Structure formats: structure tokens, C-alpha cells
């Protein structure tokens, strides 16, 4: 096992990894920007190094600065958290060059799954169902022709896209050319890659993802699934496990899990990963993408499978085999997570200083955050203040527990979105368990 790990991230995920390392007797190295000098991850780490100014390009996305700190500190591995370097293949290759273990899959796997068009083809070759569509589009004229062939509505997607960026929905064939130009431009601007492909828009649909863990010895396991259909602007708000849309459909659940494991084996996956599917009410499911990293919502899976995914990431990266079998991974109880974001009721970012913080407690209530009274919420980074996670024997019990926990949560000094979460938890469609990805559009104008 590694004796020292550098965490190439900030905020709650950096704190999460530091705590896991502490439990395992591993020393930790934090990196931080000038805006995060007093941040919690800096306070908790055994060592901390400033790597630049407040903007991401000056600090957290500065490959050379992070790698220099890792080598100088004597760290043996780098944990990327999520975002930042977690899915950057060139950074993994740099880690290899400097003799640093990267806590995640190989650069080759990240490359193959990061190209969404290539990932579709890989999934199809592995026997995993994919959404009807086409390969890379060459021109606006071809986009129009393919939209007519596939049938609207369709989605035009940047192959390097993610997080809802580089996507355009096309309702009419005559709008396909303009949408292609826009998606291509956004893909080029945000990801440095303007290549786009087209998929049929599946609606109504559920967003269901299967958690995968794989070791270097070739063992691949699925650890339940999560439903992530409560979204706004393609950003997840609430996640739960098991997926209520699969209740009574254990045959479909089993096929979905097998498809996820088959794909992970096909690409030679190592570590924690997630295969995302669209699931339609007619019982069909389709591969969307593979996230080759730890997910924000991983605590939901940890609750229902009684595992620590971060610790197993570290063990796998150190070459240890997974010591269980698939049948050792039953899903018990029901877990739910609400993302608490710093935003106004009008969905605008909220920055400032946390002047008061009261965190809910009780059995099976978890608050993952880097917030404390006096913590600064700067304008440069993701707006998530923390994640509130609960677990109960039933879904109804988990909803009640989450409502209670949200009612206890107090964050002053910045605006946050717990009222939106309570609105969702009171919605009849959500309560039925048969909600879809358009749920928040029924509650709020999504403009």
C-alpha cells in the first residue's frame, strides 16, 4: 500500500479522500489555490502546497504544478477525485512517466471511453445496447440528412462532451444544421474537440447508472445501480439506490448489470467506474457513456452495499485484488442523496462566507462537505456546498429521513437550494418512483 498520496482536487471530494487515507494509515498531500488557502482540505492534510492563483487554469488544472508537488513531497500516488484530472489521459501518462500511481484506470481506457463516439462503437461490439444514431457527422448537410433518417427528436453531441455541454436537441429536421454548428462550436470551445455525432432522443426516459469496481487481476463486479433522473440542465440534483424504475423488473436489472460488467471487461477496466444507461418505460435500456472515475453520488452506493469505494480505489491502484464475489454484493435498504448547491432561488450562483452552519445528524445520515463556519465560497469553482445522504429500510423511509435532514440543515451567508430539493421530495411524480429526466421541468422553468 502507498505510504503517501497526493489529492489533486479541492472541496468535499478532497476531504473525502483525505479521510479515507487517514483510516488506512496513509499520509496525505493537499494542493490548493490562493483562494483556498484556508479551505478544509488544506487543514486536514498532512502537507499542503499552494500551486497558483484562484482560477482553475492557474492552479487546479496546472499539470506541471501538481506533478511537481507530488514528486517533491515524496507521494507515491495521485488521487484525482472527480473533475479536473480524473479523466485526462495525458495526465495519467505524465504520472506514469514520473513513477506515480494514478488512482484510476489506464490512459488508454480513459481515451477510449472519453471519445463518446468511439465508446458507442466499443459498447456495441461488447453486445451492450446503444441508442439508435450515427457516427461522426461531417457537415451541416449530413446532420440534416441523418436527422431525417433517424427521425426527430434527436440529440447532436460533442464526442468529447460531458456535464451537459456540447449537446443540442433537434425537434425539427430543418433545425439540424444550425444545431450541429452550435454543438460543434461549443465542443471546440469547451473541450478542444468539435467532432459531433447524433443519437435518437429517448423520452420519456430514466437515467440509471451501474457502479463498477474492477481490479488488476481481471475481476469485475457491479455494486448496485443508482437512479439519477432528477436533473436540471443535465446536472444531477438527487440520486437514489436502488433505482425505483426497476422495481419489479429484476430481469432487466440483471441484464443491465451484466451489460455494464461486460463493457468494463471489454475495455480492461481497473478501479471504480460507472456505466450510464437510458431506460425507457417499454423495458429497453441503452448505453449512454462510461464515467472512468469516482462519481459525486458514490456515497449512495456505499450505504446500500456497505462498502467504501474510495478505500477500494486505493487498494486496487496498489495492486490488491478485490476479495469478494458478485453474490457478496447484495443491495440492502434504500439510500438517497441531495446535492446542496450555492445558488439563489433564480438559479444564479451565490458566493460569500458561510456565517453559520448546522449539519443534520442521526443514524444513517451523512453530510459530505468541506464547509465550516467561516468557510469562503469563491466564484471560481463548482457551486456544490455539500451532499446530504440518508439511508433507510424502504424508499418511503428514506424520503421521510431526507425531508427531516433537509429541515435540520442550516447554511447562512450564502443562498442554497434545499427548498428546491424539498419541492422535488413532495412531488407526486417523484413519490411514485416513476419519474423521468424531465421532472424538474414540470416544477420550474428550465431557462
Task: Report each predicted region and the residues it spans.
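Conserved beta3 strand of the protein kinase N-lobe
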Residues: 133-134
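ATP-dependent carboxylate activation and anion-phosphoryl transfer catalytic cores
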Residues: 7-26, 48, 71-73, 89, ...
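An N-terminal boundary/leader segment
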Residues: 1, 163-164
